[in-house]
A protein has these predicted regions:
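Short acidic/polar alpha-helix capping motifs at helix-coil junctions
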Residues: 17, 126-129, 146, 232, ...
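Hydrophobic membrane-insertion alpha-helices, especially the h-region
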Residues: 16-33
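Active-site-adjacent loops and short helices of periplasmic peptidoglycan-processing enzymes
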Residues: 2, 6-12, 36-209, 216-222
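Low-complexity, intrinsically disordered regions enriched in charged/polar residues
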Residues: 9, 25-28, 46, 316-319, ...
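Functionally constrained cores in energy, signaling, and assembly domains
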Residues: 16-17, 61, 70, 86, ...
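Domain-terminus/edge residues, biased toward the C-terminal soluble/receptor-binding domains
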Residues: 189, 202-204, 210, 215-407
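Intrinsically disordered, low-complexity regions
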Residues: 31, 49, 61, 186, ...
Length: 407
């Protein structure tokens, strides 16, 4: 076949263009591969979910309306078959004290600010007393510290002290009740509604699970825990006032609050300190000839049934390998470690599950002990999170690593 010079030149030119484009394409591809981001490192969990052998057994008393039992450390273990809203009566004062101590913290031994009793508060005392409410005597001009007001609120259960504290904290009782409801909402107490700071209103209602959760938080405040464990208090005008919680000291009960009214019957939130375990329970609507005595006796029964089934177990040890990290440019898997110990109260049948989440943006190089993720432990009714750390240095990809990626 005959080709003229123009044909040969055109073919040579086209080949040259093709080769140039091929080289440019390769350079572009290589550059892209060298500098594009790497796939995200993968964290993998090696911990296995577990369940404590056996089953938790409890017989709920038949003379209460609603109840829950559990521990301060690991949450609710058992509930009565039915649950619902119920008038709180003086159990409402747990929230009142909780808010006061959050807004005006007191260390154990501190008295806090001093308040002066007004004529309005004397009149309020007289009106509440006439109405048959639980009150503590006050006098015009009497000086009461924040601590004394909290002691009068939680020990002899003074409704009038709840109103004094409410006005001091929020400016008015209405504003304080609004704060109670907002606090309940922020804590996830979905079935709780407050109409007053003392619980005298039948419209102040909650459920045992909600009050269990609130008391878990309140009992972590040292001053709250100290006050509810006191058998009596000596106040300036009223003198010695005794705790309405007659279970104090029995079966190591260290608090927390009783509540009685015609609509409520008797309610009792209690904490029994068994070694390093706090058994926490809530009883609503105890009945019988003496409902409060029923509630107090049932609490002891529940503690006795519960305490033999509890133990403390270490679930995680500091520096324990809980999984590994896979890095695309490294062939080996790098162990990842727990940053702390974690122990909790366990019971028969308790389920324990683990989940692992990486930090949002892992940046290299990673130093030894650098936080690269979060381990979430779900145990019974509770959740705990801890940082997860790298066991060794993990270098950023080198130029050679990137170059290998091209080929």
């Amino acid at each position: 076949m005959y080709y003229n010079e123009d044909d040969r030149y055109a073919k040579h030119k086209n080949l040259k263009r093709f080769l140039v484009l091929l080289v440019l394409g390769f350079i572009f591809y290589a550059g892209f591969q060298l500098f594009k981001g790497w796939p995200k490192p993968q964290l993998e969990l090696s911990l296995k979910d577990q369940q404590i052998p056996g089953s938790f057994n409890i017989s709920w008393p038949t003379d209460i309306r609603y109840g829950v039992i559990g521990t301060l450390q690991s949450g609710i273990i058992s509930k009565t078959p039915n649950q619902g809203q119920w008038p709180l009566a003086s159990v409402a004062k747990i929230m009142t004290a909780y808010i006061i101590l959050k807004d005006h913290p007191l260390s154990i031994g501190q008295d806090g600010p001093t308040l002066t009793v007004t004529q309005k508060e004397v009149n309020e005392y007289e009106a509440f007393k006439k109405d048959g409410q639980s009150v503590v005597k006050v006098a015009l001009g009497e000086k009461l510290t924040e601590r004394q007001l909290l002691e009068g609120l939680m020990i002899p259960s003074a409704n009038n002290f709840a109103y004094i504290l409410a006005r001091w904290d929020a400016g008015s009782v209405k504003a304080f009740v609004d704060k109670m409801n907002k606090t309940a909402q922020s804590l996830g107490l979905k079935d709780t509604r407050y109409e007053d700071p003392s619980g005298a209103s039948a419209g102040t209602v909650s459920t045992p699970p909600d009050q269990f959760k609130l008391t878990q938080l309140a009992m972590q405040i040292p001053t709250f825990r100290h006050i509810v464990a006191m058998p009596q208090v000596n106040l300036p005008i009223a003198g010695i006032q005794y705790n309405v919680n007659y279970d104090l000291g029995k079966d190591n009960i260290v608090g927390v609050k009783t509540g009685s009214s015609l609509p409520a019957g008797a309610n009792f939130v209690f904490d029994s300190k068994q070694g390093n375990i706090d058994i926490l329970g809530v009883i609503f609507g105890a009945s019988g000839k003496s409902p409060l005595i029923t509630a107090l006796k049932d609490a002891i029964t529940l503690v006795d049934m519960t305490k033999t089934q509890l133990s403390t177990k270490k679930l995680i040890s500091k520096n324990q390998q809980i999984g590994f990290i896979k890095v695309p440019w490294m062939k080996k898997e790098i162990p990842i470690l727990a940053s702390q110990d974690f122990s909790t109260v366990v019971y028969p049948g308790m389920k324990i599950t683990y989940s692992l989440y990486p930090v949002k943006d892992i940046k290299f190089p990673i130093k030894p002990n650098e936080v690269i993720g979060t381990l979430v432990i779900n145990y019974g009714d509770s959740t705990y999170s801890m940082p997860i750390i790298a066991s060794q240095e993990i270098e950023a990809p080198s130029f050679l690593d990137r170059l290998r990626r091209v080929f």
